[in-house]
Amino acid sequence: LENDVKVNTLNFPQFQRGPNLVTSVINSIIWINKIVKNLEEHKPDAVIVLGGDDFSEYYSGYKIIIRLYQFYKISQKLPVFLIGHTIGPFYSWRKKAFSILMSKCRIVTRDELSFNHCKNDLKVKHVEQGHDLAWFDLPKQSNYLKYKMIKKYGLEENKYITIIPSALVKHYTSNSEDYFNSWKKLIEKLQTEKYQIVLMPHVCSDIKKDDRWAINEIAKRLLSKNNIIFIEGMLLPSECRSILSCGHFSISCRMHSAISSLQTAKPTIALSYSIKYAGVISGDVGMPSLVIDATDEKLWENGIVEIINQKVSHIENNYNEITNSLSKRVDEIKDDENNILNRYADIINENKGRPFSE
């Protein structure tokens, strides 16, 4: 940031859910109005919402309308920029709702699928295609941190496979036993190979089940923990990326851990549960061969382990080609996204806090 840029911490009011739908809607409107007032009092040059999934029905469901209304209200008072987002896909009346309520916002998607959805289906005027922000280097990302992390966990560079399961079991299958047993079978298969296995959490939470819980459930089922490293503590994003960057490849249920691996030119096998994987990994970085659509319950009953093993063979047989392609494409993405962000910085400086007219 420039030296004259002020950084404020905003104390937004806590949303109070009501005892029924009507009360919850009323409380939402009151809450949104308080947020808008809070923002206005600080007189920002812009409101910038950094992506990902804030405007995806995969996570918000019917509640997406509250989020759209929130940014409609903010955009009436201040310029709003959505940078690096997956948009939708929206269906039914929500398509029109997005088109109307977000008409003043400036949107940069993180992939071509979202861009086309905005232009062709949602009829959004002010949208352009960008990239996921995770393609940039992270604060503290360095060779020093890489070697510090592998030393901490007793790892040897390029001699381990990192596995990132997810606590979002229901995104893959309604049967948690199938989910955890599939991971057990996969790990026991990989244990017979020449690599160490590292089980690493990506999302940690003190208030709900997180990836550490998923790792613990897998660990309970393993017949042998030989040659397996369990990372149990919370890690900074740069620490996660350091571990991924020193491994041979990774297998991930979390898209941003998959991106962190790819960002350092290390292959990943991404187990997809939403369209964002197709947009960001298959599309933007051009690696559809590394993505598995893993939302079919029958796969978790029988078949997912074999499909992952086929991807492992694909990586091993094409390792240099994949890593060289990744290195080139990531550099292209960084350059393009830098140009996009610099252009929007100029727009923000010229606009000086005025809301867009349309």
What are these regions (language model features)?
Residues 1-358:
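Active-site anion-handling motifs in enzyme catalytic cores
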